[in-house]
């Protein structure tokens, strides 16, 4: 009887060990698997049924007087490639666009306006960027995806409404040096004040500043799906 109990115990222990060791690769694969990305417009529509604020909207439908300079629709960017075909439309989640509208309203009282360089960015574009610059300080690792892919991040600056000129921020867009960092302080007071104005008004309205890029801000809630949908599909549904 004792032998039977011992044998059962040994078999049970063996099964436990085998199960544990065979589970390790599965957990490892899950940890290192590619992120889930929505590529079909129909699946995107399903994803926002439970939350209408997830809707992707053309930014000017929410903030009509905002300015665009969509760099990735030109060759004037770090890739030196025209990534987007359309330079007149860009998109964000509805909740994020509304928050940006509040920022714009506050700045307009100072005769200032936001200028948008980039907003929604398809996941496949992030993959191309990563091929050129594998540095997470400046380009999102596709294994994680980015706020741009989720429709909740925006690259922007401030301009004077009267002149149309950008406020001096010390560097241009896509400057991958320490000078572009939020914590870089070896700059004239005018530049520091301009950066502080942008950061303050964005954070006041629910955005978080990226430490390595003074122009990059993302929404405080990242619980949004990664998207790899051509912007022209959103464009067809502009209300």
Language model: regions and residue ranges:
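Bacterial Sec-dependent N-terminal signal peptides
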Residues: 1-33
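Extracytoplasmic cell-surface/polysaccharide-interacting catalytic and binding patches
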Residues: 28-117, 132, 136-212, 218-239
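Aromatic-lined carbohydrate-binding/catalytic grooves of carbohydrate-active enzymes
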Residues: 126
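Intrinsically disordered, low-complexity sequence elements enriched in Ser/Thr/Gly/Pro
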Residues: 2-6, 69, 216
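Segments that shape or occlude catalytic/ligand-binding pockets
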Residues: 122
